Every structure is written in structure tokens, then in C-alpha cells.
Regions:
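Interdomain/boundary linker segments immediately adjacent to catalytic/signaling cores
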Residues: 1-53
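Catalytic core segments in nucleotide and nucleic-acid processing enzymes
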Residues: 45-188
């Protein structure tokens, strides 16, 4: 009985740990996009999650706002577009007329055994988006892309492009490719 309880507790801790890794990966990408919007002098305001409106961008408060990223459901940009955060898709790139221009799925898990499952979850989210917005750009950012997952992603018409999160963080060229793509989508 005790062994069963310990096994169950271990699985719960493992699951919670994996969820935390995924949540943190999303926050990394959210912060990266906000910092890039600041660099491009495009950030206007943070959109509060609790429905109390917007919080104007203030350079003096940026680090505090980035540290409390979960309090926001997105940001508004100078060209009247928005970057919105949610659970599915993880990030939406929304145009002036509330049209979805693109979506980003962030898969932060690093266990190779779960790579196909994460790919499948992203694909499902992208299919849902494309039913509503057939011209939307779909971007997968994953920490672990196995050869099998890469082969499927390369053949998958629902995924416009994909990036390895570790490469985006470590390699300036990959970072630049990602942000250029995202901000070109937002410029429509």
C-alpha cells in the first residue's frame, strides 16, 4: 500500500514538474516578444488578465511587469495589433480588426519520449485555428524535437514553421529569424 502511494505521489510530482517546465517556456517566449516589441518601440500597453483594462507601457516598470507576466493576457502594439497569451493557442498574433494573423504553440518539455505527443497537441491547436483563420501563420517553438517528430513536422501542412527554443535563446541568428517572422506577421 505504501509503495503504491509513493508511486502515485511520484507520478503527481513528475506531472507537476513537467507542467511547470512548459509554463516557464511559455513565459520565456512571452518575455522575449515583449522585449523585442520594446526594442522596436512598438509596445503601447499591457492587457490585464483580470479584465480591468490596460496598463500603459512604462519603461521604468518593465522589469516588474515582465516578472509578473502571468497577470497579463497580452500586449497592445503601436500598429493596433496585439500579442495575446492563453492556453490554446499559447500565443495569438491579432490584427487590427481582431483577425488572427498567426498563432504560436510553445512546447517546453525536454523528454524525448513525449516529443510526438507535444507535436500532436500543437497540431490539434493549429488545426482549430486554421478552421477559423485559414490564412493564419502557425509557428511551433519546442525545446525537444526528435528526428521522428521533425520528420512529421516537415511534412505537416498545418505547421508553417518551427523553431527549437534552446537554439532561439542561444543563437542570435535563430532569435533574429523568429522575431523577424513574428513581427512581419504582425505588420501584415
Amino acid at each position: 500500500m505504501n509503495a503504491l502511494l509513493l508511486t502515485s505521489t511520484g507520478a503527481q510530482i513528475d506531472g507537476a514538474w513537467r507542467n511547470a517546465i512548459g509554463d516557464e517556456a511559455e513565459k520565456v517566449v512571452q518575455r522575449l516578444l515583449i522585449k523585442e516589441a520594446v526594442k522596436r518601440t512598438m509596445l503601447v500597453a499591457f492587457i490585464n488578465k483580470n479584465g480591468t483594462g490596460i496598463e500603459p507601457y512604462n519603461d521604468a516598470k518593465l522589469e516588474e511587469q515582465l516578472g509578473n507576466i502571468e497577470a497579463y493576457r497580452g500586449v497592445k502594439l503601436t500598429n493596433q495589433t496585439s500579442i495575446l497569451f492563453s492556453s490554446e493557442p499559447d500565443i495569438s498574433l491579432v490584427g487590427k480588426n481582431n483577425v488572427t494573423l498567426g498563432v504560436i504553440e510553445v512546447k517546453g518539455g525536454t523528454d524525448p519520449a513525449g516529443a510526438l505527443e507535444r507535436y500532436g497537441a500543437a497540431k490539434k491547436s493549429f488545426e482549430s485555428t486554421l478552421r477559423e483563420a485559414p490564412d493564419a501563420k502557425t509557428i511551433l517553438i519546442a525545446s525537444c524535437i526528435t528526428p521522428e517528430a521533425k520528420e512529421r513536422i516537415d511534412k505537416d501542412k498545418t505547421i508553417s514553421c518551427y523553431f527549437n527554443l534552446t537554439e532561439v535563446i542561444k543563437e542570435k541568428q535563430k532569435y533574429t529569424e523568429l522575431v523577424e517572422l513574428i513581427f512581419s506577421v504582425l505588420h501584415g
